[in-house]
UniProtKB/Swiss-Prot annotation:
Xref: Pfam families: Ribosomal_S8 (PF00410)
Lineage: Eukaryota, Viridiplantae, Streptophyta, Embryophyta, Tracheophyta
Annotated NCBIfam families: PRK04034.1
Keyword Ribonucleoprotein: yes
PROSITE patterns attached to this UniProt entry: RIBOSOMAL_S8 (PS00053)
Principal location: cytoplasm
One Gene Ontology biological process: translation
Molecular-function annotations in GO: structural constituent of ribosome
Annotated localization: Cytoplasm
Superkingdom per UniProt: Eukaryota
Protein known as: Small ribosomal subunit protein uS8
Alphabetical keyword list: Cytoplasm, Ribonucleoprotein, Ribosomal protein
Family: Belongs to the universal ribosomal protein uS8 family.
């Protein structure tokens, strides 16, 4: 399999395991961006606990799934988004205003669109989940 994006492969394997009804999934290779993305998903309750396993190569992550994930994906290329431009992106990517999150990488770290709006920072769109 050709690896286009580590984050894309991680989210696709999670989404496929969720559709199959699996309780956990192993993601490899691992990266800091994948771990931060999973932290945002865990904070909002879309996944359970996850554990990083160091195999002295690229690392693995074992994620506990809880059945709440409907869809997740990566936006490529990573478009620049200002604070005022977050709203059109939420309308385009998410099914409704109260449902789902867009994950941004900002100068203040990787966070969801609501936290970025509260902190008044823009950044690049990494992906979304709902």
């Amino acid at each position: 399999m050709v690896r286009v994006s580590v984050l894309n492969d991680a989210l696709k394997s999670m989404f496929n395991a969720e559709k199959r009804g699996k309780r956990q999934v192993m993601i490899r290779p691992s990266s800091k961006v994948v771990i931060k993305f999973l932290m945002v998903m865990q904070k909002h309750g879309y996944i359970g606990e996850f554990e990083y396993v160091d195999d002295h190569r690229s690392g693995k992550i074992v994620v506990e799934l809880n059945g709440r994930l409907n869809k997740c994906g990566v936006i490529s290329p990573r478009f620049d988004v200002g604070v005022k431009e977050i709203e059109p992106w939420t309308a385009r990517l998410l099914p409704s205003r109260q449902f789902g999150y867009i994950v941004l990488t900002t100068s203040a770290g990787i966070m969801d669109h609501e936290e970025a709006r509260r902190k008044n920072v823009g950044g690049k769109v990494l992906g979304f989940f709902y």
